[in-house]
Amino acid sequence: MATKHRNLSQLNSPLPSAEEMKFGIVVAEWNPEVTEGLLSGAVHTLRSAGCPEHNIQIKYVPGTFELALGAQFFAEYTDVDAVIALGCVIQGDTRHFDFICQGVTQGITQLQIQWNMPIAFGVLTVGDMQPVSYTHLRA
């Protein structure tokens, strides 16, 4: 069934244990009203899966375009098991949106292949702020 016909917020599958895992979370500083909510939700989910707080490292980068560089830092210089990349790109009147979205998508994909490490793509790409205005409530 197509996901547009399912309320994915209502999915309730059990989380695997993250007790022994280490995570890096890289967060874009641009659109902090959105990315801070995404960060809160990610940390809450990891903690709910048993990940100790000391096994969660958080780094900030200026914008969504730089998420790949932040993820590479975690892959290359730390011992994390996985990375979560969080950002938000809001479409404007220029093609800048397309360039940023394409760049971060390709960058993160290449890093997963290069480092053989899962990098969760938590980047919202939206036409305006309305669809993301509730993210701070989704912890």
Model-inferred region functions:
Residues M21-N55:
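Glycine-rich phosphate/diphosphate-binding loop of Rossmann-like nucleotide-binding domains
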Residues G92-T94, M129-S133:
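A short acidic, helix-capping loop that chelates divalent metal ions and anchors anionic groups
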Residues E66-I108:
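Glycine-rich phosphate-binding loop
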Residues T135-A139:
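Conserved small/polar residues in nucleotide/adenosyl-binding loops
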Residues M1-A18:
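N-terminal amphipathic/basic leader segments beginning at the initiator methionine
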